[in-house]
C-alpha cells in the first residue's frame, strides 16, 4: 500500500510543477512586473 501512496504523491508533485511552470510562462508572456525576476531565472532552467 505504501508504494502506491508514493507513486500518487510523485505524480501529484510532477503535475503541480508542470502547472506552476505553465503559469509562469503565461505571466512572462503578459509581462507582469512581479514575475520579471522569476522569468529571468526561469530562462536558465530547462523545463
Swiss-Prot record:
Keywords assigned by UniProt, alphabetized: Cell inner membrane, Cell membrane, Membrane, Transmembrane, Transmembrane helix
Location(s) in or outside the cell: Cell inner membrane
Superkingdom field: Bacteria
Chief localization: membrane
Membrane-spanning segments: 6-26
GO cellular component: plasma membrane
GO biological process terms held by the UniProt record: negative regulation of phosphorelay signal transduction system
Pfam families, sorted: MgrB (PF13998)
Subunit-level organization: May form homooligomers. Probably interacts with the periplasmic domain of PhoQ.
Family: Belongs to the MgrB family.
Function text: PhoP-regulated transcription is redox-sensitive, being activated when the periplasm becomes more reducing. MgrB acts between DsbA/DsbB and PhoP/PhoQ in this pathway. Represses PhoP/PhoQ signaling, possibly by binding to the periplasmic domain of PhoQ, altering its activity and that of downstream effector PhoP.
UniProt-recorded name of the protein: PhoP/PhoQ regulator MgrB
Protein species of origin: Enterobacter sp. (strain 638)
Gene symbol of the encoding locus: mgrB
Amino acid at each position: 500500500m505504501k508504494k502506491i501512496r508514493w507513486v500518487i504523491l510523485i505524480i501529484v508533485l510532477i503535475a503541480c510543477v508542470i502547472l506552476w511552470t505553465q503559469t509562469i510562462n503565461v505571466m512572462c508572456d503578459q509581462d507582469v512586473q512581479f514575475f520579471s525576476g522569476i522569468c529571468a531565472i526561469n530562462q536558465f532552467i530547462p523545463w
